[in-house]
A protein has these predicted regions:
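N-terminal secretory/targeting leader peptides
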Residues: 1-163
Length: 163
């Protein structure tokens, strides 16, 4: 909580960060000069509390719902993973439907995705407090979690190959 607000990916170099089991996450962290540490999700909060890890690859909403906000001082928006939800249906079942019903399922799935994404985006600001400035009475505001939104120029340093 006593560190300056992160404004550069380089400020995170050398930190130990919980990484999911994905190769993409590990590779992305290595490209940012972070030290990816495989830690089970259920052990992440204890790792943060005990100082075994400096941070975690996760989303702001996960910090809020997993009650990590009391031990997190900053939420740094690195924009290297998207937060996607998945809902599936058996292809055999879908293929057995008549054409108009398949169209209705596809339209319903699309509209459900639009609605849930809009609700998630609103909750990030109104409930979690993942905004600058933060709204009062959000989980981040109540726990003094600062949000660090890096500039587009800063993000391009790591994510855009300008060759």
């Amino acid at each position: 909580k006593d560190r300056d607000l992160v404004t550069s990916i380089d400020q995170l170099a050398g930190t130990k960060n919980r990484v999911t089991g994905t190769q993409l996450g590990r590779i992305a962290m290595q490209l940012m000069n972070l030290n990816p540490v495989p830690v089970a999700w259920e052990e992440t909060i204890d790792g943060l509390k005990q100082g075994l890890i400096d941070g975690a690859e996760t989303w702001a909403s996960a910090v809020a719902y997993a009650n990590m906000a009391p031990v997190v001082s900053q939420s740094v928006d690195l924009r290297f993973f998207s937060g996607n939800e998945h809902c599936g249906m058996s292809s055999k079942v879908f293929d057995s439907l008549d054409g108009p019903l398949q169209d209705a399922v596809m339209e319903s799935a699309y509209l459900a995705q639009v609605q849930s994404q809009a609700a998630n985006e609103a909750a990030l600001i109104k409930t979690v407090g993942f905004s600058d400035p933060q709204l009062p009475d959000t989980i981040f505001a109540e726990n003094n979690v600062r949000t660090a939104f890096l500039s587009d120029e800063e993000l391009k340093k790591k994510w855009v190959d300008e060759r």
